[in-house]
Amino acid sequence: MNKRAKSKNREPLRKSPVKRGDEVVVITGSERGKRGKVLKVLRNTHKVIVEGIKMVKKAVRPSQDNPKGGIVEKEATIAISNVMLASKWEKRQEKKKVAVEKKEQG
């Protein structure tokens, strides 16, 4: 079974931990640690589009809006499980700092 068929069998998200406009941090992958604002939540595919993260180059055909066409850079989707709310991320980092300080003292 290929990846596309697998993702289509999932049920759409009923409740999402992140909403459009939220500040999120990427927690895994090549963009790990980067922050951005959620532009769109794709509930059916369990993915999000985050501003300035995972930029890809896309060939665009000439149209009335863009008579020249060419190559455009835009955001690609990221699995919703690979992002975390920035506020939650900061709390987690604070806990780690406290644990390290206690370990160094004792």
Curated annotation (Swiss-Prot):
GO terms for molecular function: rRNA binding; structural constituent of ribosome. Residues 1-20 are annotated as: Disordered. Residues 8-20 have a biased composition (Basic and acidic residues). SUPFAM superfamilies: Translation proteins SH3-like domain. SMART domains: KOW. Keywords: Ribonucleoprotein, Ribosomal protein, RNA-binding, rRNA-binding. One of its GO terms (cellular component) is ribonucleoprotein complex. Pfam families: KOW, ribosomal_L24. GO terms for biological process: translation. Gene3D superfamilies: 2.30.30.30. One of two assembly initiator proteins, it binds directly to the 5'-end of the 23S rRNA, where it nucleates assembly of the 50S subunit. PANTHER family: MITOCHONDRIAL RIBOSOMAL PROTEIN L24. Belongs to the universal ribosomal protein uL24 family. Part of the 50S ribosomal subunit. This is Large ribosomal subunit protein uL24. It comes from Methylacidiphilum infernorum (isolate V4) (Methylokorus infernorum (strain V4)).
